[in-house]
């Protein structure tokens, strides 16, 4: 529970050039969250997320995502 805002609260923001698979990507005001999946053959970031109107999970580019963040795991400071 808690949604994207709570997930973002448990992350540290990172620069876009530091994004690795598994990092979280957020829309403005944490309205939506996606997971970095890697990069396409042109080096563009790929994002896995649920998209309205698509009936499920999609892989897309980072359009609309404003902030990149890395989850802070238990035991890390």
Q: What are these regions, as identified by a protein language model?
A:
Residues 65-77:
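Low-complexity, Gly/Ser/Thr/Pro-rich intrinsically disordered linker/tail segments
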Residues 1-62:
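...with weaker cross-activation on analogous glycine-rich loops/strands in unrelated enzymes
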